A protein has these predicted regions:
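A conserved catalytic-core segment of Leloir-type glycosyltransferases
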Residues: 38-100
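Short, well-ordered beta-to-alpha junction loops that form the rim of enzyme active sites
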Residues: 8, 41, 111-113, 139
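Conserved strand-to-helix beginnings and helix N-cap segments that scaffold or border functional pockets
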Residues: 17-18, 79, 118-119
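Short N-terminal targeting/anchoring amphipathic segment
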Residues: 65-67, 96-117, 131-135
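A short acidic, amphipathic alpha-helical/loop segment
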Residues: 120-124
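N-terminal subdomain of nucleotide-sugar transferases
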Residues: 1-65
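Short catalytic/ligand-binding loop motif for oxyanion handling, primarily in non-cytosolic enzymes
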Residues: 45-46, 116-118, 144
Length: 146
């Protein structure tokens, strides 16, 4: 099965938080699935952010295929952070046809801390010629939760 996990802040043990997507992906790969994580190149949660030169730049980490989307840097929970959310979602919408064409997802999991990624997941599902399962994982509702 081809699994696409959308998480703006996904990281790895080397980079730092957010770890949840990384550990899910590792387990799915052990079960024989292909996993792609779509994440922003900048996160205030990480110790180390990836250095990328273009949107959708690929990097394989412990067998997990990451696609990095460039977003601006920010500090805190202010307006600049909200702008990066719009950047991330907008670029995913623009890249959705290529995600469908090259990744061929069977399941799309939307797992960011804000609900806008669900709209991208719905769009990817709509563009796909096959039946795609869409899952929205609610684990933190910024800015409602501290």
């Amino acid at each position: 099965m081809n699994i696409v996990l959308i998480n703006h802040y996904a990281g790895s043990p080397e980079m730092g938080m957010e770890f949840r997507p990384y550990y899910f992906a590792r387990e799915w790969i052990k079960q024989g699935h292909n996993v792609v994580i779509l994440s922003a190149d900048y996160s205030h949660l990480r110790r180390k952010n990836p250095a990328i030169s273009k949107d959708f730049q690929k990097e394989r980490i412990d067998g997990i295929q990451y696609y990095w989307i460039h977003t601006n840097e920010y500090e805190g929970n202010g307006f600049k952070r909200a702008i990066t959310m719009a950047q991330f979602i907008g670029k995913l919408f623009l890249g959705a046809r290529n995600i469908v064409k090259y990744v061929k997802p069977d399941i799309v999991i939307c797992s960011s801390t804000y609900p806008l990624d669900t709209y991208v997941g719905q769009y990817i599902r709509k563009l796909s010629k096959k039946k795609v399962t869409l899952v929205h994982e609610v684990h933190d509702m910024w800015p409602i939760s501290p």
